[in-house]
């Protein structure tokens, strides 16, 4: 998993509340258990004018020019600004996978659905909760300022606006540690690989009848 320490990124404003996981990555694209291949279909029903299908050539599909991610000024955005209850709906890790592959490192919103919130941390995507008034002000500034960037410092738990104002956010200490060090569930387990191997050795020696090759 990619570590997250500090990030400076262009902000794209998605001014919609209650964005659910089927809108983030529609159900027809969930057949793969690989973490790659979902970025081109992020927000598929909003980005394109036709109905998307798995494995099709997205470069030939008609774009919805009214959708924010298709605007030239937001190309290359790596911070998504959203409204309340982002990521609601069914549980699917494909949602943070799609956001990550598109290029987003963080999503900022007044609130998130619990399952999406948890899945994001496990996949290197930083969800940041700010007060609704702070999010409202960010929307105004982003829309009024082409090239609007935010600086996100995870160690300091701070989002810094271009005008220098610092917005503080809360994060669980364990999740913070994992993101700072790029540790997903597998990475955390591998940190104890020596202890696991030692236990397996003792277990095999004390109960050899459980193992066919003993």
From Swiss-Prot:
GO cellular component entries: 3-isopropylmalate dehydratase complex
Enzyme superclass (EC): lyase
Biological process per Gene Ontology, one example term: L-leucine biosynthetic process
Single GO MF annotation: 3-isopropylmalate dehydratase activity
Any matching Pfam family: Aconitase_C
Presence of keyword Lyase: yes
Swiss-Prot/TrEMBL keywords: Amino-acid biosynthesis, Branched-chain amino acid biosynthesis, Leucine biosynthesis, Lyase
Reactions it catalyzes: (2R,3S)-3-isopropylmalate = (2S)-2-isopropylmalate
Record pathway: Amino-acid biosynthesis; L-leucine biosynthesis; L-leucine from 3-methyl-2-oxobutanoate: step 2/4
EC number(s) recorded for this UniProt protein: 4.2.1.33
InterPro entries: 3-IsopropMal_deHydase_ssu, Aconitase/3IPM_dehydase_swvl, AconitaseA/IPMdHydase_ssu_swvl, IPMI_Swivel, LeuD
Xref: Gene3D superfamilies: Aconitase, domain 4
Record function comment: Catalyzes the isomerization between 2-isopropylmalate and 3-isopropylmalate, via the formation of 2-isopropylmaleate.
Family matches, as HAMAP family: LeuD_type1
Family in the record: Belongs to the LeuD family. LeuD type 1 subfamily.
Name used for this protein in its record: 3-isopropylmalate dehydratase small subunit
Underlying gene: leuD
